């Protein structure tokens, strides 16, 4: 699993249509039937964009594990492709079906469902943690790390696994869609922001701005693609050449991974992610690679044997991995308890629900109030019109659970059928908690629920297959909880764009089916072409080691940690709890400057280089906002998406060249003058 950045997006006022325009749209426009909202052209565009975003997600997941939201890019590119296609056919004299915001919403839903499986499918976490390379990296003699707990990636079993686990979450909460969206009036900030964006595309003002945003995205996509191609020529053979190893801050800092590697992807991530996330990542890099690891290294020979390899868990590498795990678990545990507490409080107290739920209740005059009521009535009517039968949802969940319970033990023999069945009994409750929490805070804790399942099953199964059983259970739980929250988010988007709930559900099913095939295929491209899991290469797959170590930890405990490592882990675990608590109890003007522990944890294990890149992105955005905030709000997302997509597209020809054993012609290398 990667660290997924909260998916809320800031929408500038120019993107929001005037109130009168919204009222006319909501009360007078013709709303297509749900079948008309799902089109062949829309599904074709969804498949193309889903493939692109799966590649981007895999690249981020296998390199640093931080995945920003690509929802804005999905909506924007979906609008651009279909609008361009309809315009082209119209000029040729063909009669084309108008492109509606409902069709745009279906495309958005389908794309997000597709590339979401590249994240929740575990290709950078629990699935790849099972492979032989991760086993060898931890060490054959490491307690609890057994050779029989190895299952290497295989295209067909991965596709089969995704098909049997990815659909259950969609059926688990369908009966509660009215409760979550209409009764509790949960905001689902990302879903609301996406809906406002799509609504704006289909107004005259918004369409013009969207056209300019697409031009901007295309410009920076081209620049990023050209730059990535240029960099390839100097990257040589191995992992020590090229711009990716440019000692921009000097050779001393370069040894501690402090350098700028000219990556368009990470700069784009810095432009998309909030300033506090980027600054938290940089602070984590400074604490770990600037202070902590040099300090621990000074005690080599005392705290751990000095002659160990750089990837030996009995040495410095063990500190890096386990302290990162401690911070991640501390952050995840705090947020889990917080979300459950908020959920219970809001559900048990109607008074608290009325007062505290984040519902927009701005003061309006009588005429505006009547217009808002008309809009709400229309949305409610459309949302409730196409009913999804309760019997269908229950039958779907029970049927899929039965198939999954019979199939998963065949793929992962240590995970017995009764463990799978127990997971499916408790999954709907956890899916509800996660969906409700996402609606309130925009923060999905799917990975935290997955880690809980990992620890419990690994400890129960024990040393005889516990690692594989725990990792597989993590995947089962994560898939259900994640897709359920995504579906509710999409229902909120559909509600605000006057899209049918049935078309949202069907498009989520279609997108998930696409993802079950596209996500493994695009991962297989990386797996075949690149050295995935090499700790010294670009595709480190950092969370593979972390997840396997978590499973081993659930079985063996802390017996084999290096000296003082456990004490440091306790310290950072408690620090993560305290920092999160401070973020919640201090006033917003102070809490906005308190770092996020989860973001700080990522560079502890990976390195500081990507933190430099992301900080460059956030500095560019900060300066841009000071010079022209309006332009920054309108175009920063397009620039970032272009940088990320261009670099992602280059991955395809780069992988093909690697498969064909065509190496870059030049190795650009830097060393000290005294070495000559």
From Swiss-Prot:
Superkingdom field: Eukaryota
Cysteines joined through disulfide linkages: none
Membrane spanning stretches: 38-58, 62-82, 110-130, 154-174, 276-296, 321-341, 392-412, 413-433, 452-472, 510-530, 561-581, 604-624, 639-659
Topology in the lipid bilayer: Multi-pass membrane protein
Compartments, record wording: Membrane
Stretch forming the signal peptide: none
Tagged with keyword Transport: yes
An individual GO BP term: iron ion transmembrane transport
GO MF: oligopeptide transmembrane transporter activity
UniProt GO cellular component terms: plant-type vacuole; plant-type vacuole membrane; plastid envelope
Predominant place of localization: membrane
Keywords: Membrane, Transmembrane, Transmembrane helix, Transport
A Pfam entry, by short name: OPT
Matching NCBIfam families: OPT_sfam
Family statement: Belongs to the YSL (TC 2.A.67.2) family.
Protein purpose: May be involved in the transport of nicotianamine-chelated metals.
Extra facts: Was also erroneously assigned to At3g27010.
Name of the protein this chain belongs to: Probable metal-nicotianamine transporter YSL6
The species this protein was found in: Arabidopsis thaliana
């Amino acid at each position: 699993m990667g660290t997924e950045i909260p998916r809320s997006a800031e929408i500038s006022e120019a993107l929001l249509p005037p109130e009168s325009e919204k009222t006319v749209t909501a009360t007078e426009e013709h709303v297509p039937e749900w079948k008309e909202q799902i089109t062949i052209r829309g599904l074709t565009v969804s498949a193309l964009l889903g493939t692109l975003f799966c590649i981007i997600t895999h690249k981020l997941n296998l390199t640093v594990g931080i995945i920003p939201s690509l929802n804005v890019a999905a909506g924007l590119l979906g609008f651009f492709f279909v609008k361009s296609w309809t315009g082209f056919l119209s000029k040729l004299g063909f009669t084309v079906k108008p492109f509606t915001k409902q069709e745009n919403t279906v495309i958005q839903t389908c794309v997000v469902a597709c590339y979401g499986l590249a994240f929740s499918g575990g290709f950078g976490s629990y699935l790849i943690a099972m492979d032989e390379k991760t086993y060898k990296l931890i060490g054959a003699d490491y307690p609890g790390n057994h050779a029989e707990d190895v299952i290497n990636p295989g295209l067909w079993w991965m596709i089969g696994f995704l098909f049997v686990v990815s659909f259950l979450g969609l059926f688990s909460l369908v009966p509660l869609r009215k409760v979550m969206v209409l009764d509790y009036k949960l905001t689902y900030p990302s879903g609301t922001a996406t809906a406002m964006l799509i609504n704006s595309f289909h107004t005259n003002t918004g369409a013009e701005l969207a056209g300019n945003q697409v031009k901007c995205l295309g410009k920076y996509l081209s620049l990023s693609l050209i730059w990535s191609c240029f960099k390839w020529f100097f990257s040589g053979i191995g992992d020590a050449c090229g711009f990716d190893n440019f000692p921009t801050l000097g050779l001393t800092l370069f040894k501690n991974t402090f350098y700028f590697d000219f990556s368009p992807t990470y700069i784009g991530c810095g432009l998309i992610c909030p300033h506090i996330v980027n600054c938290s990542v940089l602070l984590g890099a400074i604490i770990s690679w600037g202070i902590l690891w040099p300090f621990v290294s000074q005690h080599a020979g005392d705290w751990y044997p000095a002659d160990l390899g750089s990837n030996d868990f009995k040495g410095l590498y063990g500190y890096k991995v386990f302290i990162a795990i401690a911070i991640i678990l501390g952050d995840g545990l705090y947020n889990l308890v917080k979300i459950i507490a908020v959920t219970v409080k809001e559900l048990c107290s109607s008074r608290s629900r009325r007062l505290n739920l984040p519902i927009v209740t701005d003061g309006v005059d009588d005429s505006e109030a009547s217009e808002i009521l008309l809009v709400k009535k229309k949305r409610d009517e459309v949302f409730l019109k196409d009913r999804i039968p309760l019997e269908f949802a229950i039958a779907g969940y029970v049927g899929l659970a039965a198939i999954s319970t019979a199939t998963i033990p065949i793929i992962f023999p240590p995970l017995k059928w009764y463990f799978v069945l127990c997971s499916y009994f408790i999954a709907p409750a956890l899916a509800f908690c996660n969906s409700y929490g996402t609606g309130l805070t925009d923060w999905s804790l799917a990975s935290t629920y997955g880690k809980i399942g990992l620890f419990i099953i690994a400890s129960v199964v024990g040393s005889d297959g516990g690692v594989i059983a725990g990792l597989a259970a993590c995947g089962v739980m994560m898939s259900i909880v994640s897709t359920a929250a995504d579906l509710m988010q999409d229902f909120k988007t559909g509600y605000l764009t006057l899209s049918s709930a049935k078309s949202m559900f069907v498009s989520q099913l279609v997108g998930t089916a696409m993802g079950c095939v596209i996500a493994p295929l695009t991962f297989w491209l990386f797996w075949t072409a690149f050295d995935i899991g090499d700790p010294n290469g670009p595709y480190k797959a950092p969370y593979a080691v972390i997840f396997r170590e978590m499973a081993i930890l659930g079985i063996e405990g802390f017996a084999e940690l290096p000296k003082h490592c456990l004490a440091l882990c306790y310290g950072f675990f408690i620090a993560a709890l305290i920092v999160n608590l401070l973020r919640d109890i201090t006033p917003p003007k102070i809490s906005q400057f308190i770092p996020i522990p989860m973001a700080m944890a990522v560079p502890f294990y990976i390195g500081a280089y990507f933190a430099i890149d992301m900080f460059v992105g956030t500095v560019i955005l900060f300066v841009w906002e000071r010079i022209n905030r309006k332009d920054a709000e309108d175009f920063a997302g397009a620039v970032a998406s272009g940088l990320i997509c261009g670099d992602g597209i280059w991955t395809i020809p780069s992988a093909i060249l690697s498969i064909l054993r065509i190496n870059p012609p030049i190795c650009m290398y830097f060393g000290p003058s005294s070495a000559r």
